[in-house]
């Protein structure tokens, strides 16, 4: 099956690998000690492209994108260009010294926050993300709620399963999250997005260490759902790394599967129209996006 790109909807900027966490499932291998970050020259070239080509959505991710010194510049350029801007936020970054301005800043610019919270129980979150992460995440969610997120501003949470299994039904999990977070912590949010763990980076290492690599790939293959193909995010998303190179998705970026035309292509080498119809690079990991109800950076593809 050859997948081809449709019209561009989402420009996803991965502005660096640095993060204040080092989660077991992270497909980016992000961590506090990573140094790969988008510099000012690249950020300005990206900004020029956004202004010229006006992508409908600018999705800023990492690592923890807020740790990049050019994060606010890119947010403001995206907003001024009329894009819907998304911040992929790990929540605990809001609790870091010097970053307590984030809730008010994001609210001021009406940025959508997509926040990762792999479970509504402290035990499971701390197991996957480290001790104290759940408590910091709850504190950050309360701060986001206090400035209007979850009511007048979009706050969506992301769920990743613990271990080598597919996510449960998205609507049921969303109802459970809303019940527990609302009842126990007074937290509100808009939607829950379920994302299937990709068999790459740290999660792949875990699978191999546990002897579950083949079993997980067999599960993904056996769960292939052809109805997910039309909505795959790689068809309408362009992934940009911290140096400006292009990929069909953030997962391909982490596997260094670059969009090429005899050489590496950078964002400033292309226009949205020149990308339409190009063949998408695929691998075994792509089965994670087509398994069961499907998976994308905005959750399940089928209900």
Question: Residue locations for each model-derived region?
Answer:
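C-terminal accessory regions of radical SAM enzymes
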Residues: 221-255
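Hydrophobic faces of well-ordered beta-strands that scaffold small-molecule active sites
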Residues: 9-13, 58-60, 85-87, 113-115, ...
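Radical SAM enzyme [4Fe-4S]-AdoMet core and its adjacent flexible, acidic
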Residues: 114, 121-234
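Generic structural signal for well-ordered alpha-helices
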Residues: 11, 47, 75, 103, ...
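Canonical radical SAM enzyme core domain
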Residues: 32-45, 65-136, 161-166
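Short Gly/Pro-enriched turn/cap motifs at secondary-structure boundaries
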Residues: 3, 226-229, 277-280
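Flexible mid-to-C-terminal extensions adjoining Fe-S/redox cofactors in radical SAM and related proteins
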Residues: 245-303
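Conserved alpha-helical substructure of the radical SAM core
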Residues: 1-62, 66-80
